[in-house]
């Protein structure tokens, strides 16, 4: 009997051709916020491949290059003759203009970066319901001098003659500003105008439709085979566990490797939650002593990560062999992971990796290449915010859905320098106080991450009538949308005072608390 072909996955309604923009991922997210499915693909994607996908609209992203430079990234110019609506953003607009016979040069007046009010010159489908003089986000050093035949100017700014252009007959549009950036006041209006009014997309990309399409597909893919999932307790692996449990039930086995670097009470919470409350089979692997022994005397942060990664691999291999055999490995790969695997490694039709490889455990290191698993990656086309919505629809509680991101190596990289039981206990208690007070203040869901860091130095203090010499704790709280950039959170002084007082009074070997007010960039969120 011939093997059944897997049901074809849905094609994107909007295809985003990436020219190296830092915002390409953000464009896709904004379109999905409008309940329209979008994918990012390489600018090398051919017209034939685009025709096979048959999107309702195409967006050409921005990029760091200038279109008149040698070796500037291009796309197949035949896309402009497909009759598919196209929106060029910044570099994408300039490329469209140049390819169709217009002229792009370095900005005559001056480059334009940051907020700029746009002046609307005429009515257009693209700028419908966008207020005149509204603020948009600019980031360009080139300008359009002459438009191709058939185009008109529909908007300008003080320094940019062509802030938005239109060729209504050919359904080609361009904006010099970035509508996807939150600083653009009516940016989402522009995106919706293109997606709905111009490209005629339907708002049919929802959590419900994702589940309706994905659960039968998982059942069909797995059949009666066994699936192994390395459970970390984060939102990605937890959502995946619930999704797979709903699809295949007892054919799923979760493996939770406790390496001893988790936050206070988390291993116990996870086992109680998954195994006992929701009856999802979890194999608990206590490898605490094994991991900490390997880190004895190690101070270099990269070496710590590598050691934890290697040991994770060894434990995973040993336990999967003991519990197996398994035919499938489930991974919480998300769409940003797929995008980062980049360009020629992506199938332009599906946005999936062509050469399937096992994803690196978050911040820890990859699993062995010779593990003979087939992959189950049902979240690979979702962004983090979409995963949270799926988790909520599947019944995951807020304790997991809204949990702050936590690095794979855990507290081992929040202890600067060498790691010991004493330092782990100290940091674990301090970190719990930080999160406890942030929650009591009603700030937890407004902050991307809030945690404690233990420094490898000691400071002088006075407690009672005695001189102390103990560790300082760093309080790190940041606000962010995606972790790519972050700003330090403005925590009320009263909350900071409570955190500091509790830590120095309740945590042994700590006599000082300092507050990190560094943004990313230049700093990173984690200290190691």
Swiss-Prot record:
PANTHER family: GMP SYNTHASE [GLUTAMINE-HYDROLYZING], GMP SYNTHASE-RELATED
Ligase found in the keyword field: yes
Key word Ligase present: yes
EC numbers for this chain: 6.3.5.2
GO MF annotations, alphabetized: ATP binding; GMP synthase activity
Gene3D superfamilies: 3.30.300.10, 3.40.50.880, HUPs
Complex and partners: Homodimer.
Database matches in PROSITE patterns: GATASE_TYPE_1 (PS51273), GMPS_ATP_PPASE (PS51553)
Residue ranges of domain GMPS ATP-PPase in the record: 205-403
Protein name in UniProt: GMP synthase [glutamine-hydrolyzing]
Protein function: Catalyzes the synthesis of GMP from XMP.
Recorded metabolic or biological pathway in which this protein acts: Purine metabolism; GMP biosynthesis; GMP from XMP (L-Gln route): step 1/1
A Pfam family of this chain: GMP_synt_C
Domain Glutamine amidotransferase type-1: 13-204
Catalysed reactions, semicolon-separated: XMP + L-glutamine + ATP + H2O = GMP + L-glutamate + AMP + diphosphate + 2 H(+)
Alphabetical list of InterPro entries matching this protein: Class_I_gatase-like (IPR029062), GATASE (IPR017926), GMP_synth_C (IPR001674), GMP_synth_GATase (IPR004739), GMP_synthase (IPR022955), GMPS_ATP_PPase_dom (IPR025777), Rossmann-like_a/b/a_fold (IPR014729)
Keyword terms of this UniProt record: ATP-binding, Glutamine amidotransferase, GMP biosynthesis, Ligase, Nucleotide-binding, Purine biosynthesis
Amino-acid positions noted as binding ATP in the UniProt annotation, renumbered to this chain: 232-238
Any single GO CC term annotated in Swiss-Prot or TrEMBL for this entry: cytosol
Active-site feature positions: 90 (nucleophile), 178, 180
